[in-house]
């Protein structure tokens, strides 16, 4: 789920990044979920047994949680109510740590990186690379001082232009006490997934993408689809927008909302929503391919560089 509707990055192959690049995102006023709203959400899902008490909140999907001025309050609330949480950040900025309490309840924190040079950051995120590194160091120092002992790692997005940078990223990760996880970058909800797989992506878009993204591993995913489908199995989950609307999955934002979670009053009602969405997709094999590609982030590519996981 998201807790705001803004991101500060300009990722080329991301739904939100493209909206930032085109100016589309500027049409919408900033919204920041506050603690009372999160309290209402958590209580609703617990009271109606939509989620179990040990459910894990992933408080990120499309937007950058550190931009929410209520982030510390939400994390404090989760600790006080025994809720599990993990978080992802692009480290373009640091959250306000001043009101943050003990962080022993945080399961993990992930730092997304599109490379390890200013050149790579200029092409994708658009941040000051040195500032990003400093923000990562500051974040880990602040969290560890507050009792964080969870999994902390860099999610290194592999592009054709940044392969030689992974060793620098590994050295940096080691110096900060982080794990390194490398993945092939992919179309992230930005609309090219299906056209690429159906062969309808425009020649210009294809030319641009093939300069930067890797595609060869897609044939491996499809060739051994059953193996990877089994490997990618997850616990049941709900995907919510920042406005507490149920959305079809992690590849969608609030513009694809189905209904408000507050209109659903049982696990069975939520399951019926997702079963209905699955039925509408039918058995078109393209959706299996999209699922495989979108979940390939679970596969570490460290072995290609002789780097242990």
Where do the model's predicted regions map?
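Radical SAM enzyme [4Fe-4S]-AdoMet core and its adjacent flexible, acidic
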Residues: 2, 17-39, 72-76, 81, ...
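Conserved SAM/AdoMet-binding glycine-rich loop
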Residues: 6-9, 16-20, 35-115
């Amino acid at each position: 789920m998201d807790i705001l509707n803004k991101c500060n990055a300009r990722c080329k192959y991301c739904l939100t990044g493209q909206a930032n690049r085109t100016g589309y995102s500027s049409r919408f006023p900033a919204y920041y979920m506050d603690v009372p709203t999160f309290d209402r959400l958590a209580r609703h899902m617990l009271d109606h047994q939509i989620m179990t008490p040990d459910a894990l909140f992933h408080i990120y999907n499309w937007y950058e949680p550190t931009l929410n001025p209520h982030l510390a309050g939400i994390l404090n609330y989760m600790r006080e109510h025994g809720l599990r949480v993990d978080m992802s950040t692009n480290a373009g900025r640091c959250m306000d740590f001043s009101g943050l309490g003990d962080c022993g309840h945080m399961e993990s924190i992930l730092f997304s990186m599109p490379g390890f040079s200013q050149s790579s950051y200029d092409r994708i995120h658009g941040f000051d690379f040195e500032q990003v590194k400093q923000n990562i160091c500051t974040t880990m120092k602040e969290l560890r001082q507050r009792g964080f002992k969870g999994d902390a790692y860099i999610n290194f997005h592999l592009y054709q232009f940044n392969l030689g940078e992974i060793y620098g990223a590994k050295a940096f990760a080691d110096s900060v006490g982080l794990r390194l996880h490398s993945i092939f970058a992919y179309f992230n909800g930005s609309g090219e997934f299906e056209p690429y797989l159906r062969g309808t992506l425009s020649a210009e878009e294809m030319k641009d993408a093939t300069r930067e993204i890797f595609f060869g591993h897609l044939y491996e995913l499809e060739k051994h689809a059953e193996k990877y489908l089994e490997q990618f199995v997850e616990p049941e989950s709900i995907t919510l927008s920042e406005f507490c609307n149920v959305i079809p999955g992690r590849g969608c934002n609030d513009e694809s909302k189905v209904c408000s979670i507050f209109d659903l009053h049982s696990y069975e009602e939520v399951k019926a929503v997702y079963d209905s969405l699955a039925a509408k997709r039918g058995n078109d094999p393209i959706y299996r391919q999209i699922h495989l590609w979108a979940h390939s982030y679970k596969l570490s590519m460290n072995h290609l560089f002789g780097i242990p996981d």
